[in-house]
Amino acid sequence: MKIKKLISALVLGSMLVGLSGCNITDFSAENLLRPPKAVGDEAEIEQLIAKTADSGYTLKYPKNGKFRSAIIMTDLDGNDSNEAVAFFRNSAETSSVHMLVMYSKDNSWEIASDNIFETTDIDSVDFADLTGNGKAEIIVNSTTYTPNVGKLSCYSYSEGKTNEVGSGQSCSSFVTGDFDNDGTSEIMSFVLYTTENEALASMLDYNEDSKSLYAKAMANMDPNVVKYKNIAVTKLDNDITGIVVDGTSANEVTNTQVIFYSRDLAILRNPLFKEKAKNITRRSSQVICSDIDKDGKLEIPVTLDLPKQSSDSKNIYADKIIWNSFDTPKEALVAKQAVIINYDYMFMMDYADKWSENKVTAITDLESETTSFYAWNGTKLDTELFEIKVFPVSEWESGKSDDFTLITKDDKYAYTFNNINPDTQISLSDDEIKTGFSTLDQSGI
């Protein structure tokens, strides 16, 4: 809110200055959001950037990934002292971005290298020890003129010097981790399909002899995916570290691909993708892989339709989600938990064992902010079992909701239930409703 007020004040100020005949030439959002004047180390670093740029500069912020700052402080060489990596565009240049690597020596900041990318933006940045020497490499994906496909570059730093380790691989997104369990990190690079690139996952490893990166293993990816929604490193089983990739097609259908390196076969695997077969995780829902049981491993969602009347086009039916672990030896999903998810009000309800064989469905009424759970008799709705109602906190605290019992609340909403029919064979008790309910935030979704 403070930032919004600051921007509003600055915009108003610019209008007044404009009316007085002054000319403001660089009033971009990036400049508006630049931090206050730096002091100490930050001031010295910005002075080095200004000196290098000479004619003025604009800080460039990575668009994606873990590191979103234009000036990143991190210990590259493992000496417990931070180096600085800064991204900026020289005001005299329009199609290049500089990466300035700086280090502190004798209480003064010096430049290790000024690396120039032929690009207008930096997509993402990461740091990982790819060589096994205890020092972190700088990994940069810079944008290109091909939409959603960038160019991967990698640099090592030691004793005030920066060397290029690898450059030139096409890359839409990347993650790092020890995927072959050899004690050092690798880069897993993903490329979306274009007329110039196959949809591909590549595991890039460091070669000590050539002092460069090479593709140790590759796997085909789904060419119908046009956008990545979520790419996350996760433990699978048998001490294997893999990646789950949630991607979306042009018609907004999402699927999940699981990528891992098979040490026995020395190949990269993507078993959920088969060229002539439907991916079992294909779904129109917005859910992505999540660690729903907090065991440190991401679960993979499979969406099933709840039963509905064929002629019913009015009601909004909830989704049934089966959360699965991944069995690496069998290369198959293993069901762990079934839930009914409501995306409108961001909660889910455990799908009880007694509801097996499509005995229950759920309908959301947006006007009344209620999701009703019904018994299903095979062709139509039967008895209403219970309902979940979402109240604004202020309304709930006013006491105008005597028929409902509180489950949980946050700053905005109170989540409540009314157990309408607790005595059928498939009914839930009050305690079962309370323990089976969770918000998507609570579940990490």
Task: Label every PLM stretch briefly.
Residues K5, G21-T364, T370-F373, E395-W396, ...:
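Beta-propeller-forming repeat regions
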Residues Y374, D410-D431:
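Domain-scale activation on soluble regions of proteins
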